[in-house]
Design a protein with these regions (language model features):
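Terminal alpha-helical anchor/extension segments at protein ends
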Residues: 1-126
Length: 126
């Protein structure tokens, strides 16, 4: 399925990517694997592997709205900007949210992208 928009809900343990167009919705979940070692007791390595998997899953999606808690957003944004700068132009925005359902996320994203596309002068594909 070719989609133009996606919304990512991320926290430190999991991520959900909802790709959508006017008629279709496709969901993908990514979970963090926690494997603390004596050498990497802080879990930074695990977090980086998790964020890398999320960035890989976002590859090829033209516009993504990233949602989540403020700390989850800040940490993912820092990782993406530092380690995956090619992804930055595809991230349309960051929106803090609590724990919305998938339909609530899609509704939020549709509203966001309608505003975003109009401001950018980009026609939204139908």
């Amino acid at each position: 399925m070719t989609t133009f928009h996606a919304v990512l809900r991320i926290d430190h343990q999991s991520a959900e990517i909802l790709q959508f167009d006017a008629e279709h919705l496709e969901s993908q979940r990514i979970k963090a694997h926690t494997h603390h070692t004596a050498r990497h007791a802080s879990g930074v390595r695990s977090e980086h592997e998790f964020y890398a998997a999320v960035c890989d899953a976002l590859a090829g999606i033209p516009e993504v709205l990233v949602t989540g808690s403020k700390t989850g957003l800040a940490d993912f944004r820092h990782y993406a900007e530092k380690h995956r700068p090619a992804l930055a132009p595809h991230i349309a925005g960051y929106e803090p949210v609590d724990h919305p359902t998938a339909p609530q996320l899609v509704a939020l994203a549709r509203k966001f992208f309608l505003r975003h596309d109009r401001m950018a002068g980009t026609p939204t594909p139908s």
